[in-house]
Swiss-Prot record:
UniProt-recorded Gene Ontology molecular function terms: GTP binding; GTPase activity; magnesium ion binding
Protein name per Swiss-Prot or TrEMBL: Ras-related protein Rab-2
Keyword line: Autophagy, Cell projection, Cytoplasmic vesicle, ER-Golgi transport, Golgi apparatus, GTP-binding, Hydrolase, Lipoprotein, Lysosome, Magnesium, Membrane, Metal-binding, Nucleotide-binding, Prenylation, Protein transport, Synapse, Transport
PROSITE patterns in alphabetical order: RAB
SMART domains, A to Z: RAB, RAN, RAS, RHO
Domain of life of the organism encoding this protein: Eukaryota
Summary of subunit composition and partner proteins: Interacts (GTP-bound form) with Vps16A and Vps39; the interaction with Vps39 is probably direct.
UniProt region (Disordered), positions on chain: 190-213
Annotated organism of origin: Drosophila melanogaster (Fruit fly)
Family (UniProt): Belongs to the small GTPase superfamily. Rab family.
Length: 213
């Protein structure tokens, strides 16, 4: 299916925080309670609509183990968005966020949108990290924040789509160079610039209407 833009995402965070389950819930709308550990990198994709435009999200789900960290780093540079995930029932996964964030910012483009996600909100009785702590971390580091549940699908859709909206706004503001695919954005056949001052605004107009995802 044709699209106006393709956005590349990377999902990062400790092992067992629910990264693969979040991806599966978003792409397939199902929860798989027993999930094999990700070895290296897994992939998913889905079409969404923003501002009447078809956007394809290409999502790379990374392994949380230290042994695969070098592989994960190689995917940072080509990402427009990152979902940084911790488990609200495991304090250590929250404590490791600073390391993940430093890694992401060191190896990615400076404009990458980062969404902080506190996953497993359905397990509130086992919560070790208060929501206010997640909000404070996000404020301190300039991140978007949301709590989700891959099991119940709570806020999963919103987390992926709101990240895309942030990226789209940066495109409209001219922050992203959309001609440089290293920024994690690819122009599709539907691309029809609404702002003539945007980089790459000379592209041909695509179809205004298309099928739903």
């Amino acid at each position: 299916m044709s699209y106006a833009y393709l956005f590349k995402y990377i999902i990062i965070g400790d092992t067992g925080v629910g990264k693969s389950c979040l991806l599966l819930q978003f792409t397939d709308k199902r929860f798989q309670p027993v999930h094999d550990l990700t070895i290296g990198v897994e992939f998913g994709a889905r079409m969404i609509t923003i501002d009447g435009k078809q956007i394809k999200l290409q999502i790379w789900d990374t392994a949380g183990q230290e042994a695969f960290r070098s592989i994960t780093r190689s995917y940072y540079r080509g990402a427009a968005g990152a979902l940084l995930v911790y488990d609200i029932t495991r304090r250590e996964t929250f404590n490791h966020l600073t390391t993940w964030l430093e890694d992401a910012r060191q190896h990615s483009n400076s404009n990458m949108v980062i969404m902080l996600i506190g996953n497993k909100s359905d397990l509130d009785s086992r919560r070790e990290v208060k929501k206010e702590e997640g909000e404070a971390f996000a404020r301190e580091h300039g991140l978007v924040f949301m709590e989700t549940s891959a099991r119940t699908a709570a806020n999963v859709e919103e987390a992926f789509i709101n990240t895309a909206k942030e990226i789209y706004e940066k495109i409209q503001e001219g922050v992203f160079d959309i001609n440089n695919e290293a920024n994690g954005i690819k122009i599709g056949q539907q691309h029809s610039p609404t702002n003539p001052s945007l980089p790459g605004a000379g592209g041909a107009a695509g179809a205004a209407n298309s099928g739903c995802c």
